[in-house]
């Protein structure tokens, strides 16, 4: 809590930050040795903000989105190991070169509310102003963690933990065709989103041809938050089990419930979302 001096006003005014400590608190990890991606990403608070927001950190991980994704969306993604909290994205720059499977160490500033691309990246933990980078080795890999669409649903209690991570959902059916992404459900009946912002041309063409009721054996990609929603970013056809794709002619699509969501986290956002289940 802080108070001003009361000069030129009726009295001393005070302010408290964070205003709601059930939503967010101040603090960060202290430890011997290097900070990990998990340290940067993990939070106990529902805001999802990194405890290192605004701090310069150095982390190491294996590239899961390389030059091909940088060419499409201007970012890279790295992950230290399989599982939640272990992935993060960072801004690229002209001349940067990182290949899928490179183990890299990068230094940058943790940013939750991108000052340049607010609506695109706000509430997605990422590294900006990357000052130093080193390729330690090549030819590495990270296994995706298999999750359910419930885990990746917009209102899931664990959805934040998969941000920046390589994930796989299996035996899913296309439930909705949105202007910029697709909703899929597994046996749970709960929808998560898949997207083509990071996809190569072949994968983008495939996704563009999806129909309501299309069933897919598995979808893999990097889970991220952008343009106000969580989604799986498909990279290439290696992320799709295409041999198991078929149309379920008996699939019946209808919303069971709908909710009008507030324009969180930005109340001035002119877009209002109706979410159907």
Spans of features found by a protein language model:
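Extracellular, beta-strand-rich glycan-interacting domains
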Residues: 1
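OB-fold nucleic-acid-binding modules
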Residues: 4-245
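Glycine-centered coil/turn sites that cap beta-strands in beta-rich domains
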Residues: 248-264, 268-277
